[in-house]
Regions:
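Helix-to-loop junction immediately C-terminal to a conserved catalytic motif
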Residues: 49
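Conserved ABC ATPase signature
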Residues: 135-139, 143
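Catalytic Walker B motif of ABC-type/P-loop ATPase nucleotide-binding domains
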Residues: 160-164
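Conserved ABC transporter NBD signature motif
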Residues: 57-65, 74
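Conserved ABC ATPase "signature" region
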Residues: 98, 113-131, 156
């Protein structure tokens, strides 16, 4: 499944947010979207997901314009993993994951045995199979986010869109969730992920897309594209890049422009 964004622009009434955005995604890659608050990362995702449709330009899925694709079919192509999920009712983890098959069911139909099997396989792939009967509302740490990833896998979409998935997690759970997501790219999944943490983008991404002033500031391989100059342009923070045995680390300056 290939996603192509061509000359995408979007405005809220008279307020332009995105202007002439161009990029594509590749199967088996994690593409991180970076940029300051309010730059349009979430708006970009809402356009891609079909929530916002009054954009200019093209959003193509395997060559088809997204606005011409019905929501049920769109759900078979792209899965959305939000920052958080607060269920209205006391659904179990397995119930939550099974919601990923909704677009494949007729109205009022219940999930069948094959759907339960798919849900259990999805839970096992992200390591939450032992939580199947627990209440989703009682999960903690990175567990809810991993369950939402499992739900997306159960949806059987090949493109996963994640809007700041680790923003509310502690350090350890941030790394666990991102390592899990990066691992999915080895199975051919495409992951489009927004983050405010350049280190996460550098460590886990194949490529980065940097947005600034409504447009594309940079696009390319994470190791080559993410530089001190780009971080200054995006966040007005001075940093150094330090090479370690575990990879390159971004170190902010203690004084000066912080």
């Amino acid at each position: 499944m290939k996603l192509e964004i061509k000359n995408l622009s979007f405005a809220y009434r008279d307020h332009p947010v995105l202007q002439d955005i161009n990029f594509d995604t590749r199967p088996g890659e994690l593409l991180s979207v970076l940029g300051p608050n309010g730059v349009g990362k979430s708006t970009l995702f809402r356009c891609i997901l079909g929530i916002l449709r009054d954009y200019q330009g093209e959003i193509l899925l395997d060559g088809r314009e997204a606005r011409g694709i019905a929501q049920r079919e769109m759900a078979s192509m792209i899965a959305y993993i939000p920052q958080s999920h607060r269920p209205t009712f006391g659904y179990t983890v397995q119930d939550t994951v099974l919601m990923g098959v909704t677009h494949r069911l007729s109205p009022f139909a219940a999930p069948r045995a094959e759907h339960v099997r798919q849900a259990r396989e999805a839970m096992a792939r992200v390591g939450v199979q032992d939580m199947a009967d627990r209440s989703f509302a009682h999960l903690s740490g990175g567990e809810p986010q991993l369950v939402l990833v499992a739900r997306a896998l159960c949806q059987q979409s090949r493109i996963l869109v994640m809007d700041e998935p680790t923003s509310s997690l502690d350090f350890g759970n941030q790394l666990r969730v991102l390592a899990c997501v990066r691992g999915l790219t080895q199975e051919g999944y495409t992951v489009l992920l927004s983050t405010h943490n350049p280190q996460h983008a550098l460590t886990f991404s194949h490529r980065i897309l940097a947005l600034h002033d409504g447009g594309v500031a940079a696009l390319g391989d994470a190791g080559d594209t993410l530089t001190p100059e780009l971080i200054w342009q995006l966040y007005q923070v001075e940093v150094d890049f330090v090479d370690t045995q575990q990879g390159r680390v971004i170190v902010p300056h203690r004084g000066g422009s912080l």
